[in-house]
Amino acid sequence: MVRIAFGSIGDSFSVGSLKAYVAEFIATLLFVFAGVGSAIAYNKLTADAALDPAGLVAVAVAHAFALFVGVSIAANISGGHLNPAVTLGLAVGGNITILTGFFYWIAQLLGSTVACLLLKYVTNGLAVPTHGVAAGLNGLQGVVMEIIITFALVYTVYATAADPKKGSLGTIAPIAIGFIVGANILAAGPFSGGSMNPARSFGPAVVAGDFSQNWIYWAGPLIGGGLAGFIYGDVFIGCHTPLPTSEDYA
């Protein structure tokens, strides 16, 4: 059963919620600054050469490390979403209300945009790369790729962070989330760019003024994240039986 809740203005504007929005803004800004910054650095060091295997690994590792840190520094305040697709997936499973999730989206999009504006400034106007599908692929193929890899990301978020049965597994949630993002960039980077995150794609599109393929990075991640939220949050967690207690073995 889907457990979506709209929420209330009072809850979404509580002190705790306002702190969460600020935490999402800061963490997303730092993540995008490092992630997009690694792509800009690669282009500068190679004189805008085509991405090679070593460059792909470097960009994937930068995103994985940055997300690991971003989730870690925001986890105790906002849950460490840093991604509208993660927020939607958690909303589908009843872990955050729609209204509060909407303000998370705003914070994440603003964080990404400010990060890219800062990168544009500190690099003295170097081009901010945007996501786009590879030559020879169409938009639908890009959407399907983003659905699959975002599903993997949000499924990992549920398994390691949101599942009430996670136990000690929760301690590795940030690094597991960073690992799946890095792995997915290695797999999907040469094809769709491996975004998994509408905010990660939105900021560069704003600063570059190029929204020609940005819809792909909204449609794919939101579908994939929502599907993972439904399957894990509503089907699996919704059917959980209580964990056995010590008395059950007495």
Swiss-Prot record:
Task: Please tell me in which tissues this protein is expressed.
Answer: Roots.
Gene Ontology terms describing biological process: water transport
Cross-referenced PROSITE patterns, in alphabetical order? MIP (PS00221)
The entry's keywords:
Membrane, Repeat, Transmembrane, Transmembrane helix, Transport, Vacuole
Spell out the SUPFAM superfamilies in the cross-references.
Aquaporin-like
Q: Where is this motif: NPA 1?
A: 83-85
According to UniProt, the name of this protein is Probable aquaporin TIP-type RB7-5A
